[in-house]
A protein has these predicted regions:
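Charged, low-complexity intrinsically disordered terminal segments
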Residues: 1-519
Length: 519
């Protein structure tokens, strides 16, 4: 219930059943690989299918041959088909603050209604706000932006507004600043997909990224078979129960607890491990955000950085969490030979594609520049920061081109340390993912799996540059980016260009009014 102290999810008690089978991990790079893999996995379900996504548009087209051969066209069709086969379906979709993120909130409800109106009896779908509610004082702090958004909401047709938004217009509302950000699906406790990619048409892309900038979307997920799938199931069961306890909106006839929910194990390396960020409503008098319960993403990243000896490779949508920057800097000082390759989008999505210039975006970029400065002082020329740009000239109306090329948007969350540790999942390297939002990722240590993922990504980004030196060396990535910067877009090799630090510094403004966990 709101305001109640949430019990921390159990992590240390192992299951009593046999868990000795081998774990198999397959990287899925971009939606071209992930979407069909998810469809095929769903079609293999025999007993149960559990899904938890931030964005899941019921209208998204199906891509796998098996689904299309059955005459199915959209994800709504596939969910109905799966439930009618007798598979127990539970879908947990993220909801969003009805005032500050009204468009996302309405989209979430529209998709939930689309699924829910077609699903047969026995299927269950919850669209859940995170339980955290900001203290009432923040309604006064944000009075003017709230009033502006409520005024805009009055221009929207009544039938397009949700019940939450109708209540908001009558003055009955809470600020809901935290969300479920994870992206995962698990079938029969046997196999799962976990990563950074949600499901809608906007996110469809291929490793060629041969589309207009606003259609590009680089992301990474994993298909996992073996013991971690049971842990993903247990994590889903915990999140599902919390949504029920908070009386989240149900779009089907029933919502029931997951039977035999189990516990998320904490196996020692080299066994792969599911890690989470989990928070609750702390009910502090002046609280804006959530009380952190589990910060396993932060802990595992710091532990991996402490063991780094030669090379750290990171792909992230954001790099704003100062504790991680300081941990990287400490690793650089301990290991004079340690190198860092950091790959990020040129700017945040809202800046590139929506032209956002508000103080919150400028402050968020200032947090990122601060983290880059911390690392650059420690690593010096052992660090390179790069952004992917298509080897094609920008068109007249393309948003924020870089050195004449069309940008590729990066949404991946990948950290690879030497040949012994990789982390792939939903958590960005920002305070929100480390402390507030509900997140889930997989840490794995098998050398073949770790190096296989790193080499696949390097070959995609570097292209022919991959063969010109050590792909684990920051120097090779820097040289590839600088050589491309000196060429015309159509003459470039691969995607790498130097991160546009100068224009991001001009854009950023440090305004430390709100907690860094909000960004």
């Amino acid at each position: 219930m709101p305001g109640a102290e949430m019990k921390e999810p159990e992590t240390l008690r192992p299951r009593q059943d046999a868990r000795a089978e081998e774990t198999r991990i397959q990287p899925l790079i971009t939606a071209e690989e992930m979407f069909p893999a998810l469809e095929r996995m769903v079609m293999r379900a025999e007993r149960e299918l559990f899904l938890s996504f931030r964005i899941f548009d019921a209208r998204t087209r199906l891509r796998s041959e098996g689904a299309l051969e059955l005459g199915l066209k959209t994800w709504a069709d596939l969910m109905v088909h799966t439930a009618e086969r007798g598979v127990k379906l539970r879908m947990l979709l993220a909801d969003f603050d009805p005032i500050f993120t009204g468009d996302l909130h309405r989209s979430a409800w529209a998709s939930a209604r689309n699924f829910g109106s077609r699903l047969p009896d026995g299927a269950e779908l919850i669209c859940a706000l995170h339980e955290c509610r900001s203290a009432p004082v923040w309604k006064y702090v944000f009075h003017f932006p709230i009033r502006k958004r409520l005024d805009s909401m009055r221009d929207i047709p009544d039938e397009s507004l949700t019940p939450f938004q109708h209540r908001s217009l009558r003055g009955d509302w809470d600020l809901r600043p935290v969300t479920l950000h994870q992206k995962l699906a698990v079938v029969d406790g046997r196999e799962a997909i976990i990563g950074g990619l949600d499901v809608d048409e906007r996110r469809w892309d291929t490793p060629d990224h041969d589309q207009s900038p606003e259609e590009t979307w680089h992301d990474v997920s994993l298909h996992v078979e073996g013991p971690p799938a049971q842990d993903i199931r247990a994590h889903f069961a915990h999140c599902w129960q919390r949504a029920i306890d908070d009386d989240a909106t149900c779009f089907t006839a029933e919502k029931s607890p997951v039977p035999d929910p189990g516990h998320v194990r904490k196996p020692a390396p080299p066994a792969p491990r599911v890690i989470r960020t989990i928070s609750c409503d702390g009910s502090r008098p002046l609280q804006l955000g959530a009380k952190t319960m589990l910060r396993e993403h932060e802990e595992e990243h710091i532990a991996a950085f402490e063991k780094a000896e030669r090379s750290i490779y990171i792909e992230s949508q954001f790099f704003r969490h100062a504790p991680l920057a300081r941990s990287l800097a400490a690793a650089a000082k301990r290991r004079p030979e340690l190198e860092l390759i950091l790959l990020m989008p040129t700017e945040p999505e809202e800046v590139i594609f929506q032209g956002a210039t508000g103080f919150e975006m400028r402050h968020a970029q200032a947090l990122q520049m601060r983290c880059l400065d911390i690392c650059q002082r420690a690593f010096g020329d052992r660090m390179t920061t790069v952004s992917p740009v298509q080897p094609r000239p920008a068109q007249t109306n393309d948003p924020l081109p870089l050195r004449g090329g069309r940008v590729v948007y990066v949404h991946a969350k990948v950290t690879i340390v030497d040949d012994h540790t990789a982390i792939v999942g939903s958590a960005n390297l920002n305070g929100r993912s480390m402390r507030w939002d509900t997140e889930a990722s997989l840490v794995f240590h098998g050398r073949e799996d770790v190096m296989g993922l790193r080499d696949r990504l390097a070959r995609i980004w570097l292209d022919e540059h991959y063969e010109e030196g050590d792909p684990h060396s920051a120097a090779l990535w820097r040289r590839a980016a600088e050589e491309n910067a000196a060429r015309k877009p159509e003459d470039r090799v691969g995607f790498m260009l130097p991160y546009p630090e100068r224009r991001n510094r001009r854009f950023s403004r440090f305004l430390p009014i709100l907690p860094p966990e909000m960004f």
